[in-house]
Amino acid sequence: MLGDAALTNGVTFEAFNNIATTTKRMIVVLNDNEMSIAKNVGAIAKYLNEVITNPRNNRLYSDMNAFVKNLFGEPAAKFTEKVARDAKGFILPSSFFEYFGFMYLGPIDGHDIPLLEKYLNYCKRSTKPILLHVLTKKGKGLDAAVRNPEKFHGATPYDIVTGESTSNSDKSVPNYQDAMGKTLLKLAQKDPKIVGITAAMASGTGLSFLKKDLPAQFFDVGIAEEHAAVFAAGMACQGFRPVAAIYSTFMQRAYDCAMHDVCLQKLPVTFCLDRAGLSPNDGATHHGLFDISFLRPLPNAVIMQPADEDELADMLYTCVESGKPCFIRYPRGKGEGVQMKENPEKIEMGKAEVLRESDSSATIWALGNMVKEALKAAEAIETELGVKIGVVNARFVKPLDRELLLKQADKNRLIVTVEDHVAAGGFGSAVAETLLAARKKCGVCIIGWPDRFIPHGTDVATLRAQFGMSTTQIMERVKQALQES
């Protein structure tokens, strides 16, 4: 089963390339609804659309009908539609797919179940690879989903009659993706060299604002994150300052390109890694829990994470002005509800922010959305034990604020790190490596997600509690580490 948007991805054609020489019996159903998450883009989408809508192609039905009637008479009329449909399927668009060794059938109505069964049974009897092209309507069966297919691609709880979300979240608080998108638009309005790039995720990454107001500075490359990275590198070579907005989990696809085409070349590309950390409603595949581990070893890379949406705006501005390969990671969903400045400000590269001083017992270095949890844990420990735990908003994974970290290692007997990322190879590992290299004797406690794939969940709080990442569990880990240090 292949979605039509998958035809914008190179891996699909790598598989197609093997069909003629390796496969005798194979059925590929091309589910063509002209959508991935958003509207499809590119040459393949254009080609499929022309196959379906070209008036010359569609006239084949009526022309074949007239031909059969004239040749065989009225009794043959009942067979006309079948003959015309088969002729259309076998003749018109077949050349494209037959180059890959497929016999092409279709397009047919994917919602006509008897017709679909008839074609599938025919495909089963074939001794050669077949591609069956079916046309469907994204969201069919639910009017609200048909009206807004992009919104319902990954739906939160909603009213089945109106289609409106039943979430109780504060609508006055912007999503991180929207805060990023609006900031990018503001920056791009002042500088035509600032451009936004998405891999078929304009709405999901917040680039819909740029698409609407500055379409000439917006580029959708289709579901092809690796191409998005190389495309950004090419634009950077020509003096542009590209911002590529990609989900953290999909950055894995673009890793090689980010390494060789961006970081090795020291090109000024900013990658905005949306859905970094937990993304519970999107399922196990969408948790962004590995990006620090695979990006941290890249020379020339700058990696950061904001504690709130206002800091995200500052980081985006800092990155596009830095002239360096930068990666900003931030979570799914609502921001912290802080007041955002009218205009973003630059942040000093590699500098953390002390939010709470310690009494020389322990300091928590928290990254991004875990800063709030660290503050809660520190306050709870002080209330319970009378011990004042320090808290630092780390901001940067790379370059790490080494100067501040070493000072705090001399002052405290314990350094704790907390991150919305796997513990292995993440921010905590960077802190531990720095302290070990400097021969510091303080204890280190790394709090992050365990070495396993985190499953789908209904909400962040439930998954955090399940895997030892809730505020209470962080507090208990710190207390235990204090006793052992």
What are these regions (language model features)?
Residues 215-220:
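Short pre-catalytic strand/loop immediately N-terminal to key active-site residues, enriched for Gly-Thr
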Residues 1-9, 32, 97, 243:
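DG-centered beta-turn motif at the end of beta-strands
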Residues 231, 242-245, 255-257:
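Catalytic phosphate/nucleotide-handling subdomain of diverse soluble enzymes
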Residues 6-19:
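Acidic/histidine-rich catalytic neighborhood of metal-dependent amide-processing enzymes
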Residues 157-161, 296-341:
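Helix-enriched interaction subdomains in cytosolic or periplasmic regions
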Residues 21-151, 167-183, 189-212, 226-230, ...:
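Thiamine diphosphate
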